Amino acid sequence: MPAYRSRTTTHGRNMAGARGLWRATGMKDSDFGKPIIAVVNSFTQFVPGHVHLKDLGQLVAREIEAAGGVAKEFNTIAVDDGIAMGHDGMLYSLPSRELIADSVEYMVNAHCADAMVCISNCDKITPGMLMAAMRLNIPAVFVSGGPMEAGKVVLKGKTHAVDLIDAMVAAADSAMSDEDVQTMERSACPTCGSCSGMFTANSMNCLTEALGLSLPGNGSVLATHADRKRLFVEAGHTIVDLARRYYEGDDASVLPRNIANFKAFENAMTLDIAMGGSTNTVLHLLAAAREAELDFSMKDIDRLSRRVPCLSKIAPSVSDVHMEDVHRAGGIMAILGELDRAGLLDTSCTTVHSETLGAALARWDIRQSNSESVRTFFRAAPGGVPSQTAFSQDRRYDELDLDREKGVIRDAAHAFSKDGGLAVLYGNIALDGCIVKTAGVDASILTFSGPVKVFESQDDAVSAILTNKIVAGDVVVIRYEGPRGGPGMQEMLYPTSYLKSKGLGKACALITDGRFSGGTSGLSIGHVSPEAAEGGLIGLVRDGDRISIDIPNRTISLDVSEAELAKRGEEERARGEAAWTPKDRKRNVSAALQAYAMLTTSAANGAVRDVKRRFGKN
């Protein structure tokens, strides 16, 4: 039977000093012997998805104490990708994921905590905490701050549900008046919470449900709704139970690596494909799997993408459908239920709240459940009042969305498409693969071929789009923006948004070794691996070349002869130390980002660090 980790600092004569310090934090004699639970919060006033978390850590802490544990809260950093977007601030977003994972490890191991509740929400925070949970492998429960309500705006006499991306596109559309743009801006983000569509933050919070590490509703119940409070309360009780089961009952099944095993990662990726999640989720699931020491790779994602249909389309893939609509249709448990009925899930996987995923679906899938409380839970609705306060309203829809033929969530027989919402493409320009969010690609451009216009920075591409140098039929290539080449693998939300504002969203392709925001739609292909900075073929593309894309057959190719590519490769290598670097780009790369670039790996590996490669260790 494993001993409580915290005994290292709470027991024995030689720990008198440590106990003295614990006492100074409020612990009493009766607390030495209880599980010490880390409450890992991420409150910040910089990020709307986290601005309401300040008191929620203490809410969880009080519930932990009521259940017989000792709670100790600390904070991680949190970057707002939307505010960091479109300038050098975005260089720091993906690297912050590693800092978050490390900071959790540092705090939990330095203080010998026995278990943890991870209070996350936005883009890199949930992945960073997930990586830490898999790395530490102590009992853990995830609870997110929840999605924000979709904005509502009246334009030309019609009411539309809007979000951040709509405001960005409107601002770049010269046909929109300043007044309408300002109306859109003021309406797009009305409440606290993670941005309202199936963007990266909400995608990841949904995936924790499929991994079995969070409670039902974690990904979909609104930040402002009173029902979300129950998740925080239950997280506090659940983590104490898990800690006791492991340390006192010798039940290792409650550990993150045994819950989120290979089959659970397959379930999560299956959900991701079915709901058309953010392409960033591929990076983060690969990274978390690596921390769990699982051999889960791009090949597995490719395999799953060929058999899983698209069962839901949510903003940005379609307008007027947001997370509040997904919740009304039964949330993530409803999508998992449809996948189960299609024979696409392994329901024997365990969860932090149920013996198996199958048992969880029997209670929480609204097509199976007979529970009136479950149906009431999924009728939670937006309040329609601007608010930065959690649990500030308790409005409910009159009815659930149970339409599985034409509703927000479809059954397999009425899927939006036979192919799922994400796909892996391979070809000479992406030998290790690249990712496209097919749920956001118009059917007319699933196959596409066009002349290339090459840019070695996002800024140059944006300038070309806004000055009308990109025309229908073009393939825009942005390179040297990968994990190492950026460094930091910037998101390309501005280029894709500006293409839409110019009416080119269905007429152009954008290819990059960088990545895309969860808010991106259109023929946007990212994570091209190997990246240009590592000698990838994308570094040899020239203006006027043609690139052919065939999503149904999962291929992408640079239509240039092997002899010509070999010649270009020799010319590039002849540049010496300057080889495989951008020719004219001026970018201030800080020491912190240089350190990240030295240790990071390919997007095909989740852009995780490889210390062994850098220092030559086996």
From Swiss-Prot:
[2Fe-2S] cluster binds at residues 122, 195. Its EC number is 4.2.1.9. The keyword Iron-sulfur applies. Functions in the biosynthesis of branched-chain amino acids. Catalyzes the dehydration of (2R,3R)-2,3-dihydroxy-3-methylpentanoate (2,3-dihydroxy-3-methylvalerate) into 2-oxo-3-methylpentanoate (2-oxo-3-methylvalerate) and of (2R)-2,3-dihydroxy-3-methylbutanoate (2,3-dihydroxyisovalerate) into 2-oxo-3-methylbutanoate (2-oxoisovalerate), the penultimate precursor to L-isoleucine and L-valine, respectively. Belongs to the IlvD/Edd family. Gene3D superfamilies: IlvD/EDD C-terminal domain-like (3.50.30.80). Keywords: 2Fe-2S, Amino-acid biosynthesis, Branched-chain amino acid biosynthesis, Iron, Iron-sulfur, Lyase, Magnesium, Metal-binding. One of its GO terms (biological process) is L-valine biosynthetic process. SUPFAM superfamilies: IlvD/EDD N-terminal domain-like, LeuD/IlvD-like. This is Dihydroxy-acid dehydratase. HAMAP family: IlvD. One of its GO terms (cellular component) is cytosol. It catalyses: (2R)-2,3-dihydroxy-3-methylbutanoate = 3-methyl-2-oxobutanoate + H2O; (2R,3R)-2,3-dihydroxy-3-methylpentanoate = (S)-3-methyl-2-oxopentanoate + H2O. It holds the Pfam family ILV_EDD_C. Its cofactor is [2Fe-2S] cluster; Mg(2+). Binds 1 [2Fe-2S] cluster per subunit. This cluster acts as a Lewis acid cofactor. The gene is ilvD. Signal peptide: none annotated. The active site is at residue 517. It comes from Rhodopseudomonas palustris (strain ATCC BAA-98 / CGA009). The modification N6-carboxylysine is found at residue 124. InterPro entries: Dihydro-acid_dehy_C, DihydroxyA_deHydtase, DiOHA_6PGluconate_deHydtase_CS, ILV_EDD_C, ILV_EDD_N, IlvD/EDD_N.
